[in-house]
């Protein structure tokens, strides 16, 4: 449960309170009962109860004597009919406290209700009991009763606290979640938001940080209210909440939720920035998260940083449990699959870091199931004037098969042979490419054939001139 039981308020001596005090949170007067005092015999026993609860051991650590407390309270219980109503209310308060310590919530609930039934119970005892009953009820899943008690508490308390509003908001949220009829669900979610906003407002006025859970509940409510307020309004309201959460409580899930909302609203730049913030804070720990950031960086003309993100994911290791052996191993977040390696190599290539792209593409080619990766590798080699390597890679790709466009690969292969002045082999590759049905490829191949023939003649002529000059000498 997101609601936890708070410390309990209890009274054991004289209570002096003004007869009427203005309520700060409502346009009403809160009337207090006259100040009351315990009977002497009851007061003595209550003093012993307090002493037992405040007992410390020889090291000064708290060591409550609950056994003595229970004995004294049982003695008071046996004399219950002879006690005054106020005395019984104090007794029930201590019984409730004891049951809470024992985590016997049904008994604590019963004790608080008996306290409220006492006609002479004072306002401080009543409001503390009502608040505790609201907490107990909600902790036990009885949200309807919990809401009833917190509303009653609000009627009787002088000042409604932020915690009170948040408790009510939590109750409304759970009631909404439990309802089957959509209109009832949405009504409760709206009430939950209103209550949580009141809690946040009070916390801000009193200059302390609102609780994380208050915002979480509001975000969940706004998400559920899509049928009533529309998808865009729902997303914008959630956006406001998550923008607060990432600043106050910078957790991974809040960054991802915020990024997801930006993405749904087509705010790609904000989506990228938010994911990058999570990355910079080292919050990302899943392959999909690293790849999503790299992809959006790449699509926004940041190939260098896309590559850096993927590299970081390859280096970062997280514990993974083997399903068969149940052994925990430290494995890289981003795995060296063919797809991931090609993504990384392409990013380095687009960043003009060909020297970094080549070893990655070499690794991708070794694990590839088809020849296409070798073709890409060959193109990278060619761009770096590694002609022999380019020829070898492209030939391996063509031999392996399943190449996307064999004719284009032949063109690239022919260009590599051309640069090595292997003119006959170059023309052979260009002629194969020229058989393609694609007009552009056919035209390019034929142009290369003519260019190669001309270059071959030029080179031969240069060689003849060189030989002639040497012979003349």
Predicted regions and their residues:
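TPR/TPR-like (Sel1-like) alpha-helical repeat modules
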Residues: 186-201, 247-248, 263, 280, ...
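Conserved small-residue packing positions in alpha-helical repeats and bundles
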Residues: 49-52, 56, 96, 134, ...
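Generic helix N-cap/helix-start motif at coil->alpha-helix transitions
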Residues: 38-48, 84-92, 122-132, 157-167, ...
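N-terminal leader/linker segments that initiate helical-solenoid repeat arrays
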Residues: 10, 18-113, 121-132, 139, ...
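Solenoid-like repeat scaffolds
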Residues: 31-37, 77-84, 116-123, 152-159, ...
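Alpha-helical adaptor scaffolds
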Residues: 338-405
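Alpha-helical linker/edge segments of TPR/alpha-solenoid repeat scaffolds
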Residues: 97-107, 135-148, 172-189, 219-238, ...
